[in-house]
Amino acid sequence: MRFDPREIGEVLEMLLFRELDIRAVTLSVNTLPAIRPNLKDTLDALSHLLEPYARRLRPAAEKVASKLGVRIVTVRLAVSPTSIMLEPLGDAKAAVEIAAFLDKLAGRHGVDMVGGFSAFVHGGVSRGAAALIESLAEALNSTERVAGFLNAASTMTGINLEAVRRAARIVLSLKPHAAARFAVTSNLPEDVPFMPGAYHGLGQPDAVVNIAVSGPGVIEAVVRSLPDADVRTLHDAIKRAAFKITRLGELVGREVAKELGVAFGAVDLSVAPSPKVGDSVAAVLEAMGLPRVGAPGSVFALALFTDAVKKGGAMAASTIGGLSGAFIPVSEDAVMAQAAAEGAITLDGLKAMAAVCNTGLDMVGIPADVGPDVVAAIIADVMALAVHLDKPLGVRLIPVPGARPGDFYDLGGLYGRVAVVDASRYSRIPLVARPGTAPPGVERLKKG
């Protein structure tokens, strides 16, 4: 990989003045060899397997960060879906113990999060998945670093409404900090570096590094420098900035993988915001010409932005992976959160934007007294978009006790301030109480 002096200078400016960083180095590890018929042997095998990786992950990332002069915000582990490990155990209490083990392992070695406490239930619920589902609320409420998801829909199988309903009940039983580590997903790829969607895919090598990038402040500066540019010029400028951001992610990923002696996987092209000033995707959209994110034109602006990021990033990475598009996590983007609190952007507006981004409804606050029918229906709406557009999407809702629309709840750190939105004027939605799985759409027929 070669860099010319001008490109190096541009990247240095981004690092020093535009909040450019690497959002996450995620080491994904195959934990299926640790499957055992009893809990004690499972935990012993997990410890033997994961300790060497966990011990070396942060030192390797810090060495690369120091060498390159790049800030790496978080280091993360991802494990094989825990539901698979629970198949011989079939016990929710065992699942809680595994979550506690992963949490302590991460804390002991300075790993910020562990993903993969998850199950794929888009076609049905297996014995291990049932145990995991039963454990999720207790496991996430009692840990700090464990993240998980339920994949409740796919283009190939449709939408499992029973899984959607169970996921809704889980969401409403989670404390706000725990809810930030849980998502309901669809069509989830195997190499996601972002939480809570990270897990070790069945088609991956035993250990692989995947990279999540950031940099909306870089793109905002570029957009603001072109106030009178035509749309094609604006698109091209965003594309070129995304290229530079992704090149940095590729370089860091290769170096960390080399330090760890594992495979380098992919760069997730998604430009992730943070609660910091000058690090907002919503601010980019407003710089493009929106009076406020959520105003008419927001879907168009986000589509233009996402397309440019994908095209620029794809040229810069040897392999693209994960979700690769644009992130609009409401609480993690200070400008987006403020717009939501003001009512400029609504739940339905966010659903519309989900059609052209890659996160779905992410980090959206809702009153904790909302009924499970409403939460299930919100999830089902996003699952329907994912299935019929054949794309990965997720739902990460934060129930806030005693809150009303327009209120904030401060989660702190990268999670930011959760803006609570109006979820629904209705309390019962009988449609989502119907049993069964909604069949896949016409997109399924195109796949043979």
Curated annotation (Swiss-Prot):
Classification of source organism: Archaea, Thermoproteota, Thermoprotei, Thermoproteales, Thermoproteaceae
One Pfam family in the UniProt entry: DUF711
Alphabetical list of InterPro entries matching this protein: UPF0210 (IPR007841)
Originating organism: Pyrobaculum arsenaticum (strain DSM 13514 / JCM 11321 / PZ6)
Family to which the UniProt record says this protein belongs: Belongs to the UPF0210 family.
Source organism, top-level taxon: Archaea
Protein name: UPF0210 protein Pars_1033
